[in-house]
């Protein structure tokens, strides 16, 4: 009875997390072309100029290995791409976009993996780095890589699924706050115990057993919940890194990127 009650609770949690998801399995964050005027061309927001410096540093790193200006934080997944993909493939499949996920009207910079092309659009779910603009500067938010998947939900929650081995797997649900910091909704993780593995939960995103409450969830149920989050994450439309030098951020909505969703 206790397990059925807990399972009902986390299913309810999933329904809340997926609120706003809609009826399509792969919700797509759209891009919008704005009228190009001379005045708009001159009025480039300062955050966009600063984000352009970050994207330019990633472009140079992928293109020729120059990491002089590559941000120290948020480079793990980007370095993996350069290590395992050929130069041209990396420039084609690594993408960038601007999207307001904190709700403050100023977009974040998202860098991620392009998994498919449909029409003229390039789409993917895996995010390698997120940067925000707070206190007049670019600020690192979060990163993903091969063993720590970072994805976006339809309600702009960020979901991390990763781990350091079969005995320590993590599912974290967080949200970017307007001050540039991540707020933790909750975290589930596995941890060794006397008779095998336990599944724990806390609300502070600390993955230590002594800082969390053990649940009645089985490891199989935990893995099922992780899969549900992955299935309901949204696709993001990226601009390929290879086009950055000639395109910049052209084609992306400025300032109020969540308004067209």
Stretch-by-stretch model annotation:
Residues 22-65, 161-261:
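Acidic, small-residue rich beta-repeat scaffolds with periodic aromatic anchors
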Residues 102-114, 156-161:
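Acidic/hydrophobic-patterned starts of short beta strands in beta-sheet-rich repeat architectures
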Residues 32-90, 135-149:
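Blade-edge motifs of beta-propeller repeat domains
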């Amino acid at each position: 009875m206790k397990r059925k009650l807990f399972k009902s609770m986390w299913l309810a949690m999933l329904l809340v997390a997926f609120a706003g998801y809609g009826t399509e399995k792969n919700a797509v964050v759209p891009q919008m072309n704005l009228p190009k005027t001379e005045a708009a061309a001159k009025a480039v927001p300062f955050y966009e100029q600063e984000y352009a410096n970050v994207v330019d540093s990633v472009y140079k790193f992928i293109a020729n290995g120059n990491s002089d200006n590559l941000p120290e934080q948020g480079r793990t997944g980007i370095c993996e791409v350069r290590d395992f993909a050929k130069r041209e493939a990396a420039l084609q499949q690594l993408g960038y976009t601007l999207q307001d996920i904190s709700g403050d009207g100023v977009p974040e910079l998202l860098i991620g993996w392009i998994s498919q092309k449909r029409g003229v659009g390039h789409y993917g779910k895996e995010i390698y780095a997120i940067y925000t603009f707070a206190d007049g500067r670019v600020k690192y938010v979060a990163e993903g890589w091969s063993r720590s998947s970072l994805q976006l939900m339809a309600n702009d929650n960020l979901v991390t699924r990763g781990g350091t081995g079969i005995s320590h797997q993590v599912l974290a649900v967080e949200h970017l706050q307007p001050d540039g910091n991540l707020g933790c909704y909750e975290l589930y993780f596995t941890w060794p115990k006397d008779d095998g593995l336990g599944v724990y939960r806390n609300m502070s995103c600390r993955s230590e057993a002594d800082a969390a409450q053990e649940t009645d969830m089985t490891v199989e149920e935990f893995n099922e919940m992780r899969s549900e989050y992955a299935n309901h994450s949204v696709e993001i439309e990226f601009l390929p890194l290879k086009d950055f030098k000639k395109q910049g951020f052209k084609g992306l909505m400025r300032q109020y990127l969540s308004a067209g969703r």
